[in-house]
């Protein structure tokens, strides 16, 4: 899909490459994509090189952040291949409050889980500062 790498979650578009695509053609819905979605996807794919640096930065930042927090005792963080880190904490309410203090929003799930989207280096450093303070305060 184009959602993660190109920041186009709202257009709901993906593509497929392969040798046997013709066999799938009978399964396709006619006019499955709006002309707006097709135009956006076409423009983005024509400029794919411009997105490569952004993707490399996201991967690098994701790995940097994961390496720092993976050994924290108050968090369980999971390896990721996406543009976010997924974690759990039994003290999630406190963690969320600490993020709120710094005007940082993370995805909150009903159980002890949360998700942190990878941002710019500066944004990620702010997130790491909160995670460090959380770990230190609860150790």
Language model: regions and residue ranges:
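PLP-dependent aminotransferase class I/II
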Residues: 1-71, 76-77
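Short acidic/glycine-enriched loop/turn segments that link adjacent beta-strands
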Residues: 10, 81, 110-113
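PLP-dependent enzyme catalytic core of the Aspartate aminotransferase-like
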Residues: 97-102, 107, 111-139
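A short acidic, often aromatic-flanked loop/helix-cap motif at beta-alpha or helix-coil junctions
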Residues: 4-6, 86, 115
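Conserved PLP-binding catalytic core of the aspartate aminotransferase-like
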Residues: 59-63, 67-102, 118-120
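Asparagine-centered polar/low-complexity signal
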Residues: 32-34, 83, 124
